Amino acid sequence: MAYFDNAATTYPKPEIVYQSMDQFQRHTGGSFGRGNYGFSSSAKSIVDDTRAALQQLLHCPAKQVIFEPSATISLNIIIQGIIEKGARNIYISPFEHNAVTRTLHHYETMGLGKVVELTVNKDLCYDIQRIRFQFDNTKPDLVIVSHASNVIGLVAPVEEIFTLAKEFHSLTLLDMAQTAGLVDCDIGKDIFDFAVFAGHKTLLGPTGI
């Protein structure tokens, strides 16, 4: 079979992924951090090792790595929390996933936020000067950028955009679902407040993390 949907989910996985999942379910599957017995301790070691590996890969503090069932859930938790805390001027890229746009549309229809797309030129490249003009006119509370589009493949100049956003004291959220482990990005820098990615795409892992 020829498989061409890797931008949605990579397949097949490396053999070690299948073996590790089988090993975990048969011999580890305890509740992480909720018991003082062998299975629970083994699960904690796996989680701690995974955090350390992600720290090496993405240059982020291991203790700031949080696991959720999906990138969609992670994005929703972050966006809802920030809006509930009072953020109203939300800027997004023109290439956001439905996990972002539908959540923001929900709040916008409730009168709890205004959503504006960051400016791109006719070649679909970000226009930093025009984005600065946008921020000058309406100060951002939250700037959300998809690191790469899984439709057209455009990689956003995220450091430029987020550095500009920080001049206006905005929170920043990077959707790395398409790029984690594939495109180098130092999310340990102060310009990154939140970064979300999935295990089942470019990290070649299973779904559900």
Task: Describe every region a protein language model picked out.
Residues 1-209:
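Pyridoxal 5′-phosphate
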